[in-house]
Amino acid sequence: MSAYGLQRLYIGGDYVDATSGVTFDTFDPATGELLATVQQASEADIERAVQSAREGQRAWAAMTAMQRSRILRRAVDLLRERNDELAELEMRDTGKPIAETRAVDIVTGADVIEYYAGLATAIEGQQIPLRAESFVYTRREPLGVTAGIGAWNYPIQIACWKSAPALAAGNAMIFKPSEVTPLSASKLAEIYLEAGVPAGVFNVVQGDGRVGAMLSAHPGIAKISFTGGVETGKKVMSMAGGSSLKEVTMELGGKSPLVVFEDADLDRAADIAVTANFFSAGQVCTNGTRVFVHQSVQPAFEARVIERVKRIRVGKPSDPSTNFGPLASAAQLDKVLGFIESGKREGARLVAGGARIVEGDYARGQYVQPTVFSDCRDDMKIVREEIFGPVMSILSFVDEDDVIERANDTIYGLAAGVVTENLARAHRAIHRLEAGICWINTWGESPAEMPVGGYKQSGVGRENGITTLEHYTRIKSVQVELGKYQPVF
């Protein structure tokens, strides 16, 4: 008997059975136990979701912006009231420590909805004078039906991040969570409905990449917001363009550089590096996995990193003292272990971790040791490719120009950071680093006000911040002539 039973689709304000006849199972990453059996959506189910979203969106867009704002604020209140309940569900689904899901996942999702609830009434056009008796005005209008495709590392947070600007602008959204962590998105749908969002405005369809492809190719969907891997993102963009030239926003992978200069506070630098690699067991898109350390301070920096890695508390996710849990799936565990073996084969020096954790009950879960390699080379697989697990690669440098060039030598451009006491150098380096999200003397915070997205193959467009509303509206220009019309013929 599974803990959460049979999971159905959420369409039109209620749970409905999928018509595909296909199901898949989802498991607790910490124990291997069956969590739920999930129904997979069919093409007919997607059609039903689109039609439901169209109907709901008309009612939602007909409300005033202030009405939509109040409803979204009520959803925020409900999320915060149910934080602990949702955090436990997220813990079981992702394997994250309960201390983390209580403090981060729902909290940051609610913050973003609150932020866009406040901006709903600020969506406005312009008035452009042409001459004494003629002017143009513009309107920002909703796109209609949009779709969000989530990743497995932050299920409910991503659902909030994608739906908040969409709904604030008057759109509907059909959301597909990852099949690896499918449980919490439907709870958000329940909360939206309870808060007063019309039925159909936020639908949840379950399934694997085939369902994502149906959404991407559907001509009735005006926009796709996708979070995931680069190769899948390229497929989504191709299908979106090929079907209806729909707009896409994508937050994709990263192999982000963290540069520690010789004047850095090494205790601070080590704290930042360990957080930037081992928070959420390393399953964060923006992780600073390429740690470039000035040659003169590398030994002292390594010693501090090792000291902090020893303090990491691996344990059961339900234990409030645990701050490092399992990876989200068996497939991800195998992938990470493969990268670790690659690092060993290619000659990187292993200074911490390097193996699966198999003692006692840990053998039932997807646990891997926090792993640190040093003396890495730029051509190593662990340095070039996104691992998405708890593996830090330390590389040395001696010259600022050289390290910037090496840091930028990647297909990715999601995040970057520097640690230095010299603020002039900090800004100079950051301005040269090719990344969409940058940190100076810190790492990882992504407040609602901060646009998030990447350069190069790390993404298209932005999430969060005021600019994101532009991705969920379209501009209509209207000319008004007050004077006599001058005929051409």
Swiss-Prot record:
NCBIfam families: BADH, PRK13252.1
Keyword NADP annotated: yes
E.C. number(s) listed in UniProt: 1.2.1.8
Enzyme class label: oxidoreductase
Family annotation (PROSITE patterns): ALDEHYDE_DEHYDR_CYS (PS00070), ALDEHYDE_DEHYDR_GLU (PS00687)
Family assignment from sequence similarity: Belongs to the aldehyde dehydrogenase family.
Binding site for NAD(+): 150-152, 176-179, 229-232, 253, 285, 386
Residues binding K(+) 1, per UniProt: 26, 93, 180
Organism: Paraburkholderia phymatum (strain DSM 17167 / CIP 108236 / LMG 21445 / STM815)
Site location (Seems to be a necessary countercharge to the potassium cations): 247
Organism domain of life: Bacteria
Modified residues (Cysteine sulfenic acid (-SOH)): 285
Protein name: Betaine aldehyde dehydrogenase
Names of required cofactors: K(+)
Assembly description: Dimer of dimers.
Record keywords: Metal-binding, NAD, NADP, Oxidation, Oxidoreductase, Potassium
The keyword Oxidoreductase appears for this protein: yes
Gene3D superfamilies, A to Z: Aldehyde Dehydrogenase, Chain A, domain 1, Aldehyde Dehydrogenase, Chain A, domain 2
Residues of the active site: 162, 251, 285, 463
Cofactor remark from the record: Binds 2 potassium ions per subunit.
Pathway assignment: Amine and polyamine biosynthesis; betaine biosynthesis via choline pathway; betaine from betaine aldehyde: step 1/1
Transmembrane spans: none
InterPro entries according to UniProt: Ald_DH/histidinol_DH (IPR016161), Ald_DH_C (IPR016163), Ald_DH_CS_CYS (IPR016160), Ald_DH_CS_GLU (IPR029510), Ald_DH_N (IPR016162), Aldehyde_DH_dom (IPR015590), BADH (IPR011264)
Catalyzed reactions: betaine aldehyde + NAD(+) + H2O = glycine betaine + NADH + 2 H(+)
